[in-house]
Amino acid sequence: RSSDLEYLCNKFRPSVIILVHVLGHSNNMKEIMRLCKKYKIYLVEDTCEALGSKYNSGNLGTFGLASSFSFYYGHHISTIEGGMACSNDKNFSKIMTSVRSHGWLRDFNNSEKKKIMKKNNISEFQSKFSFFYSGFNIRSTELNAFLGISQIKKIKKITKIRNRNFNVYKKELSDFFLVRCKTKILSSFGYATLIKNRDKVYKNFLKKKIECRPVISGNIAQQLFWKKNNKKTNLPNADIIHKYGIYLPNHANQTVEDTK
């Protein structure tokens, strides 16, 4: 709820909000953008599961300072591994370009390099192995790029199929699962719901060779890496998802018959 988010904004005064569009569903972007403007907060969108989804007339991933997308093989499109990051802020985009490649300036043009070198008093010789940002080696390859560019052209078709499959699930399982969706155009990643007898349902799905999973990480504070290093956190709604959440598969190659 927006009131909960505003409470957190008031209490912690964050500089950045990282917003996850879970399984393709949009958040209330109008209200979130209002709060970001009011409290002068940068918005970063995790759009890894929502490529193609829209809120009103805007694509998810285009509202904040930056957004991330995953092209892992199980996602909307695949480059085998990797993904993309987007931003309409030129300076931030340049920083991301550097961070992707160790923090070097090797992907910058000559005038940009000289400007940064002069500002930081770095000689041309030193610049060949100077790390201007704390970076990573997460550069993509021509093969990954070719796969991504060829598939991004199909995203409207992929979105249409995934949305169709979601609606088939919704109709066929209406007596069992209640799912509300307010996303204008939904590029569904999976069909998620809450079930009290989740383990029993999971075993039945396995017998029928139907894959299903927990709703991503559930409550992140229940994950071992967090529990070992942080104080106990009270997140009752996330606990419910952690305990009862489950989602069924959705894919562009999944037919209506497969879904039923």
Model-assigned labels for residue ranges:
Residues E6-N10, V16-V20, H25-R34, K38, ...:
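PLP-dependent aminotransferase class I/II
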Residues H21, V44-E45:
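Conserved short alpha-helical interface segments
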